[in-house]
Amino acid sequence: METIPITVSGAKFLEDELLRLKDEERPRIVNDIATAREHGDLKENAEYHAAKEEQAFVEGRIQEIESKLSRLQIIDVKQLNQDGRCVFGTTVSLLNLSDDSEIIYQIVGEDEADIEKGKISCHSPIARALMGNEEGEEVTVNAPKGDIRYEILDVQYL
């Protein structure tokens, strides 16, 4: 079974989502189904069908999270050898060498990736180019719109 790399905060987020789904969403949906059943004929009961559809979605998500939690490889970046190398979990400051713009990314697992929050998947082209390199080095990212060159300004183990 393949392990899934994730940061400590990413694992906590999944655990919190699982608790919310089990403790809040599941009971609410069961109640919605019971209420909809009281309205009579189930064949034409839109509320009942909507609640059953939502139940299927929530149960599927619960199973997905439970499966992932059993395969997580939780990586506490603060415990890693802080040698200035870009590795999973590090926060990396970059200088785009074509336009001198600076950007900061944290390299995280698939479930944590959120480009708007500066969190990029460890499988993304940028992360793959950065991994193993260190402060002061230049990397080339093979992006869909062409190659982009970056200088690694700083690597933080937050």
Spans of features found by a protein language model:
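Residue-level signal for pocket-adjacent positions within structured domains
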Residues: 1, 16, 37, 43, ...
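N-terminal cationic and glycine-rich segments that engage phosphates or anionic surfaces
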Residues: 1-63
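Context-gated lysine
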Residues: 12, 22, 43, 52, ...
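Conserved NTP-handling cores and scaffolds of large molecular machines
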Residues: 18, 22-25, 69-73, 134
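Amphipathic alpha-helical coiled-coil segments
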Residues: 59-73
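Non-DNA-binding regulatory cores of transcription-related proteins
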Residues: 75-157
